[in-house]
Amino acid sequence: LKLRYYQRDAIDSLHHWFANRPAEDHALIVLPTAAGKTIIFSHFIKEILAKDPTARFLVMAHRKELVEQAETKLKTVWPDAPVGVLAAGMKRFEIDSQILIASRDTLASPKRLDAVGSFDYMIIDEAHNVPPSSHTRYKKIITTLSDRNPMKVMGCTATPYRMGQGYIYGNRKDHFFKGLAYSVSIPELIRNGFLCRLSAYAVNEDAIIDAGAVALKFKNGDFKESELEKIAMVDDTILQVINDWIDNAY
């Protein structure tokens, strides 16, 4: 699998970051959706293990789909990769794997955190989900494992900010990531033919939800999905959205 120029640049930037920064300086790479973030960290893992066959990796994601995607992409890059999965939703508990792709919620239990041992590198997919609060599952996992062994940590995201916090990297106390190891923009990837140009269409105004008319509850700086579903998942709205999509997409 031939890497695109920016994917190679991102990997080289990560190597440089970890070679020149202390372990507590966590790195962030920012690439648009569909730029191949999973391909990047899969190649990065393979290159590190080629130099240090004893290194151990934890890839952490918060959704089952992201766990499955990470395993698939890693095996595409490296079919014989020593990879396993820890995810209750997939009924897989391969905790001794050299490359462990783990569901955040499955790993967060004290029993499993104790059982997985230590890691040299941690990769966090969809890193904007790491909240500033220290009393979260993410922080519990990271703190516990870092106390066990000072891991080198990197995050991947297309959106390096959170509501109520702003950017998730920098030198403030609530910044988990110390800086950008690498980033590339949507316009650059469009210009170079790696992403399609965008065409945006507004849906029929009959389908627009008046969220201001309902007292929606927040959770971790965002609307609660269950609250949104109450006003969004209704037949008239869904039908109008589907009709608009068909009219504009075909």
Explain the meaning of each model-derived region.
Residues 35-40, 53-76:
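Conserved Walker A/P-loop ATP-binding site and its immediately adjacent core
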Residues 56, 71, 78-91:
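Conserved RecA-like helicase motor-core motifs
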Residues 125-126:
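Walker B catalytic acidic pair
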Residues 89-121:
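Conserved helix/coil segment N-terminal to the catalytic DExD/H
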Residues 21-44:
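Walker A/P-loop
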